[in-house]
């Protein structure tokens, strides 16, 4: 089926909360970006990103979270 004849599927609202940094050329498809999170350049976000997280990739995955007890960013395995 040609692209022009394929149906458009609604994936849900895009929500960008307070203090979010979004890099260049990012696509956000039906997802919520949590407070004070960072989305790396060229990422494709298809799932919700928690507060105080750094995500990157295609599809985007959380790669770091902020630890308030240690006051530092912790890498996510």
Where are these regions (language model features)?
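Short-chain dehydrogenase/reductase
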Residues: 21, 38, 54-56
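Beta-rich strand-turn-strand
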Residues: 25-38, 43-47
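Long hydrophobic alpha-helical segments typical of transmembrane helices together
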Residues: 45-46, 54, 59-77
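Flexible, glycine/small-residue-enriched loop-and-beta-strand segment within the central core
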Residues: 1-33, 58, 66-67, 73
């Amino acid at each position: 089926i040609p692209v022009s004849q394929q149906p458009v599927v609604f994936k849900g609202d895009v929500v960008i909360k307070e203090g979010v940094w979004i890099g260049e050329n990012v696509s956000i498809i039906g997802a919520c970006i949590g407070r004070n999170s960072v989305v790396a350049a060229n990422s494709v976000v298809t799932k919700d990103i928690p507060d105080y997280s750094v995500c990157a990739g295609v599809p985007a995955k959380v790669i770091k979270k902020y630890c308030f007890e240690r006051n530092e960013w912790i890498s996510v395995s």
